[in-house]
């Protein structure tokens, strides 16, 4: 009987990507198969996030539930990974001594040996070090699960915003070699992936080493990914205004595979608050980037992150944020009340705002953006939209569910053989959280670009033979 693995994931898309790699790694090394039932699992892994308030307590509550399982089944291995593990590794060992393995985002590739060590020595094992990009060298080949896939192209962040723990939990910015990124995407394309989402804490700061010693910029990488046959839609997240340079904006002019939707966090519309956050841009500079983007791609829609109730935020500061929201006309946002993260400078800033005021401001902000998002959705009524079919509709299994470039879910009638393909649909109805459409044309009637096959791309990337000799085919 195969061994069972359960992974519980909290947090960002990078954590989701890391969890998928943990599953691939443990399957390849030890034959573990995923389960959703904790009682079945031989290994229980918690991949944590420290961005939101009470992240640590949430971890210990979950571990308390798993301890009950371990009491009944002592052989179960419990592991804690992710950003809370990096931040609170010693505290986890003290407060939850029954945890067998503690690992950070950069050491997940060592999971098989850490689990084996904890079992053989009957003692907890912890590795929360930062061995740069080493983890990608030890991961098995990617396995596609559907028509979309995440691909991590860099790790860490070097910006040190005063409210953010990422530099302390994931380390400084480190980019994966260009060849490695392209090889992984080409492998996914061969397995039927049509859309890739390039991931990084500061993804547009990518500077990937090339085989000839040169450096590949993010703009160059986008064009190379777009050239792979089968990859017809590219997203990326999360980007930073400081490095959203003109060469990246130029890619929107000539690369149709790059979607007309961008998540570009601004956090606040107040220059005073941005300075306190150590965000190296002003509201005007942010709007300048958006103007250039809309010149290059007139139909592009923008989303952002916002922090409400940052220490010292006045009513004027908040109104500056509301003005920016209206000026830019954001389509959606991830918005939160400020939550002090231990170890960050902003955690020590004095704050005299009441919780009621913070909640009122968050509500006002979210209502404004929701209204703007609904207006965008209504403008789509009667238009044709190219969508990627993801699977059956969640509400009606006799229908299909697809996604537009601007992240709207569209439900429509169609046959199952369309799953994983692009179709053009006419939008016939608009709802709060989805759209309805009808098929206009299928992929066989489209003129999708084909530049280089996945096999050709893999042949062009740097590989090592059995003796460890690196080769490159130009």
From Swiss-Prot:
It catalyses: N(6)-dimethylallyladenosine(37) in tRNA + (sulfur carrier)-SH + AH2 + 2 S-adenosyl-L-methionine = 2-methylsulfanyl-N(6)-dimethylallyladenosine(37) in tRNA + (sulfur carrier)-H + 5'-deoxyadenosine + L-methionine + A + S-adenosyl-L-homocysteine + 2 H(+). Keywords: 4Fe-4S, Cytoplasm, Iron, Iron-sulfur, Metal-binding, S-adenosyl-L-methionine, Transferase, tRNA processing. Residues 143-375 form the Radical SAM core domain. Residues 3-120 form the MTTase N-terminal domain. One of its GO terms (molecular function) is N6-isopentenyladenosine methylthiotransferase activity. Its main location: cytoplasm. The keyword 4Fe-4S applies. [4Fe-4S] cluster 1 binds at residues 12, 49, 83. Its cofactor is [4Fe-4S] cluster. Its EC number is 2.8.4.3. Residues 378-441 form the TRAM domain. GO terms for cellular component: cytosol. It is found in: Cytoplasm. [4Fe-4S] cluster 2 binds at residues 157, 161, 164. It comes from the Bacteria. Binds 2 [4Fe-4S] clusters. One cluster is coordinated with 3 cysteines and an exchangeable S-adenosyl-L-methionine. Monomer. Catalyzes the methylthiolation of N6-(dimethylallyl)adenosine (i(6)A), leading to the formation of 2-methylthio-N6-(dimethylallyl)adenosine (ms(2)i(6)A) at position 37 in tRNAs that read codons beginning with uridine. Belongs to the methylthiotransferase family. MiaB subfamily. This is tRNA-2-methylthio-N(6)-dimethylallyladenosine synthase. It comes from Vibrio vulnificus (strain YJ016). The gene is miaB.
């Amino acid at each position: 009987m195969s061994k069972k693995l359960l992974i519980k994931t909290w947090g960002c898309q990078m954590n989701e990507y890391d969890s998928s790699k943990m599953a691939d790694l443990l399957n390849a090394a030890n034959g573990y198969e995923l389960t959703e039932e904790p009682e079945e699992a031989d290994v229980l892994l918690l991949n944590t996030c420290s961005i939101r308030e009470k992240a640590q307590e949430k971890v210990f509550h979950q571990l308390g539930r798993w301890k009950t399982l371990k009491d009944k089944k002592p052989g179960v291995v419990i592991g804690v990974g992710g950003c809370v593990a990096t931040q609170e590794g010693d505290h986890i060992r003290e407060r939850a001594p029954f945890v067998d393995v503690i690992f950070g985002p950069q050491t997940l590739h060592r999971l098989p040996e850490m689990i084996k060590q904890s079992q053989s020595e009957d003692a907890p094992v912890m590795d929360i070090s930062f061995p740069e990009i080493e983890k990608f060298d030890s991961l098995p080949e990617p396995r596609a699960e559907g028509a979309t896939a995440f691909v991590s192209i860099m790790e860490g962040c070097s910006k040190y915003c005063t409210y953010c723990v990422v530099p302390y939990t994931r380390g400084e910015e480190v980019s994966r070699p260009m060849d490695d990124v392209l090889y992984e995407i080409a492998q996914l394309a061969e397995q039927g992936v049509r859309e890739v989402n390039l991931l990084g804490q500061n993804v547009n700061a990518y500077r990937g080493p090339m085989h000839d010693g040169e450096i590949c910029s993010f703009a160059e990488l986008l064009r190379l990914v777009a050239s792979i046959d089968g990859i017809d839609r590219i997203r990326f997240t999360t980007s930073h205004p400081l490095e959203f340079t003109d060469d990246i904006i130029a890619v929107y002019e000539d690369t149709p595979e790059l979607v007309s939707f961008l998540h570009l966090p601004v956090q606040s519309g107040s220059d005073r608050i941005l300075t306190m956050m150590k965000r190296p841009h002003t509201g005007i500079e942010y709007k300048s980037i958006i103007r250039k983007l809309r010149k290059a791609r007139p139909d592009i829609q923008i989303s952002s992150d916002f922090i409400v109730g940052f220490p010292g935020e006045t009513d004027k500061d908040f109104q500056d944020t509301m003005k920016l929201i209206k000026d830019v006309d954001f389509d959606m946002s991830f918005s939160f009340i400020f939550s002090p993260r231990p170890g960050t400078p902003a955690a020590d800033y004095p704050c005299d705002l009441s919780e009621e005021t913070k909640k009122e401001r968050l509500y006002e902000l979210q209502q404004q953006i929701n209204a703007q998002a609904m207006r965008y959705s209504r403008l789509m009524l009667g238009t044709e939209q190219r969508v990627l079919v993801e699977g059956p509709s969640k509400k009606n299994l006799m229908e299909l569910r697809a996604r537009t470039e601007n992240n709207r879910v569209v439900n429509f009638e169609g046959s199952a053989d369309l799953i994983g393909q692009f179709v053009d649909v006419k939008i016939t109805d608009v709802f709060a959280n989805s759209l309805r459409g009808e098929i206009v044309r299928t992929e066989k009637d489209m003129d999708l670009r084909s530049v280089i096959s996945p096999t050709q791309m893999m042949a062009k990337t740097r590989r090592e033979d059995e003796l460890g000799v690196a080769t490159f085919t130009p």
